[in-house]
Amino acid sequence: IEHASVKECFNELERLGFEVVRISPNKDGEITYQDIVNAVDDNTFLVSCMLVNNETGYILPIEKSYSIIKKLYPDVITHCDCVQGFLKVPINVRTLKADLISISGHKVHAPKGVGALYVAKGTRISKSNLGGKQEKGFRSGTEALPNIAGFGSAVEVFYPTIKERFEYVSSLKEYLINSISKYNWISLNSKLDGSPYIVNISVRGIRSEIMLHFLEEKNIYISSGSACSKGEKSGVLGQFGISDKLSDSAIRVSFCETNTTKDIDALVDALVEGYNKILKS
């Protein structure tokens, strides 16, 4: 269920001859901490898991998993993709037990094209490319200072209000779920206890791209999955036990603190209108 930015790295490692163990959700659509810990053995040197799934909002039990792994296998390097969780759900680098944490600016109102990698003290990593001495010699090339400054400003603005925004956006998620529950042709693909910032639903009988184009005409812009895999069928939903038919009609609704219940009302009204018009056409 990992993002392509991580998944493709491990695919390349596998092509180079490394053994890669991939963990899929169980029949209940869950990945437990036991699943993650049991995948590690004496030959493992790297574990990488996302904190929040970018298509469904599912939250993985990283803190408990990595805490146990570090006790059993202290030399294993742990990485966590926190792009969908940073400034949205509480993250404590001390208790997360991740040696490496990757975050990105474009998910938190910062400029696109800027991110950061947290490296725990004592963790040794190789240079990502050769050249100058920028970024402590890890990544050469002239830094995009406006982007970096914008990312820093976003952190300063949004970090103090993580809890308040989480509670508010949780109310929006609840409002949306209640609003669509009266329509048996809309299926909820996200779990109730996942991140409130992402809700994945399926409009039965209508392919994602058709509904998305209809919503665009109403100035409502959502997506059918990961923006990095536009036009490609999602394999993530299938991993969570969602059928091919529902996956083909899945759309992802993403919230932020500036959204309101009026936005949700407009979305649901448009879904109803689109459902009636598209199926009759």
Predicted regions and their residues:
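Pyridoxal 5′-phosphate
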Residues: 1-281
